[in-house]
């Protein structure tokens, strides 16, 4: 992998442009490819909407074609809310995040990924199923997980086996693992096991973010995945990234300035208005630039919500390595953890002092006889 960029803060325009050109995102593969004329098919699921279709497409990637049907294809007597309408989506591995120049040393190159939930510990040989069949079932499962997230409902292994991948129990670890990976990389949704005995799971936004970009209706799709991608790029660039670098990454995902996307809407609005208003990003003119050039920085909400160690673990997981493989960022993440711990201690001390003062004041007060 290319060497990691130097961790420099916001620099003069000339230096920043030079660094951006040498770093780039060479070799990155697009995690999303959008096709406007996606076809639809019928799902075999019995307990989630018929508009969650199976895909007949074959892929060797880790995330699969998701081809929701149009609302008109859902039967009128189906009382379950329709899932969102979207174009065909394909997620290839490695993703843009996985292709970022993260390598800072040769150490830790053989590090293993973090352990998965107990349900996923043993993955069967995928050769026992055709790749196209795996793709189809993972697609069904991702659609099911998205619906459950939209409905804010937990899920169980038994429910998945009954509703989505019936007759595939032996392959549940493989299918569930790949569907969970797709949920994380594309939509920024973590599938967390909350009961190892009963194999029950909840779906939550990754990295502790309190934003998913969804509207009030169930037609909306979570946008946390693309937000994490942008914040990751800004992080490894030193919290200050030229606008051109961001658009380069988005273009590889099939997102273009001024072109409406069926899931994300108009990308420029998302970047420069929605996320700026949500305080996840700052968008400003590069000082002294003429003609004007712009750059992105982390906003106050990103700094408040995202632990750098969590983000580094996310990037390491995507790259199949260990956070210690990136000593420069790991050192910064440790510093962030220490600062947060000190803030918690200070807050606790202040609360204790206030409670003590209040108690003393109450105890010294006496009623007149």
Swiss-Prot record:
Record field: compositional bias (Low complexity): 39-62, 348-369
Span of domain MAGE: 134-333
GO biological process, one term: negative regulation of transcription by RNA polymerase II
Keywords, ordered alphabetically: Nucleus, Tumor antigen
Keyword Ribonucleoprotein: no
Coiled-coil spans in chain: none
Cell location: Nucleus
Functional summary from the UniProt entry: Not known, though may play a role in embryonal development and tumor transformation or aspects of tumor progression.
Pfam families per the UniProt record, alphabetical: MAGE, MAGE_N
Record's protein name: Melanoma-associated antigen 10
Region (Disordered): 1-131, 340-369
PROSITE patterns according to UniProt: MAGE
Organism: Homo sapiens (Human)
Gene that produces this protein: MAGEA10
Record-linked InterPro entries: MAGE, MAGE_N, MAGE_WH1, MAGE_WH2, MHD_dom
């Amino acid at each position: 992998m290319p060497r990691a960029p130097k961790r420099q803060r916001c620099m003069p325009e000339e230096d920043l442009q030079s660094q951006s050109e040498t770093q780039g995102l060479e070799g990155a593969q697009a995690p999303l490819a959008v096709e406007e004329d996606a076809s639809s098919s019928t799902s075999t699921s019995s307990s989630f909407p018929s508009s969650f279709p199976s895909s007949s497409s074959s892929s060797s990637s880790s995330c699969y074609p998701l081809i929701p049907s149009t609302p008109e294809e859902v039967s009128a007597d189906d009382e379950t809310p329709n899932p969102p309408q979207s174009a065909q989506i394909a997620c290839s591995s490695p993703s843009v995040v996985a292709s970022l120049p993260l390598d800072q040393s040769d150490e830790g190159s053989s590090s293993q990924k973090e352990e998965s939930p107990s349900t996923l510990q043993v993955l069967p040989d995928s050769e026992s199923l055709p790749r196209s069949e795996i793709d189809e079932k993972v697609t069904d499962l991702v659609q099911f997980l998205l619906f459950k997230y939209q409905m804010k409902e937990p899920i169980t292994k038994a429910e998945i086996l009954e509703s989505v991948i019936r007759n595939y129990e032996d392959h549940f670890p493989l299918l569930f693992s790949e569907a969970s990976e797709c949920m994380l990389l594309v939509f920024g949704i973590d599938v967390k096991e909350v009961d190892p005995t009963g194999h029950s799971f909840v779906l939550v936004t990754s990295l502790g973010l309190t934003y998913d970009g969804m509207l009030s209706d169930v037609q909306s799709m979570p946008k946390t995945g693309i937000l994490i991608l942008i914040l990751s790029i800004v992080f490894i660039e030193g919290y200050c990234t030229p606008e051109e670098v961001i658009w380069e990454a988005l273009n590889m995902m099939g997102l273009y300035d001024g072109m409406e996307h069926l899931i994300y809407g108009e990308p420029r609005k998302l970047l420069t208005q929605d996320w700026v208003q949500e305080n996840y990003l700052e968008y400003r003119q590069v000082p002294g630039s003429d003609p004007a050039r712009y750059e992105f920085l982390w906003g106050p909400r990103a700094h408040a919500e995202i632990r750098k160690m969590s983000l580094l673990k996310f990037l390491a997981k995507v790259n199949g390595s260990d956070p210690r493989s990136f000593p420069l960022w790991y050192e910064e993440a440790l510093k962030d953890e220490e600062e947060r711990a000190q803030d918690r201690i200070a807050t606790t001390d202040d609360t204790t002092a206030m409670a003590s003062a209040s108690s003393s004041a109450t105890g010294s007060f006496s009623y007149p006889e």
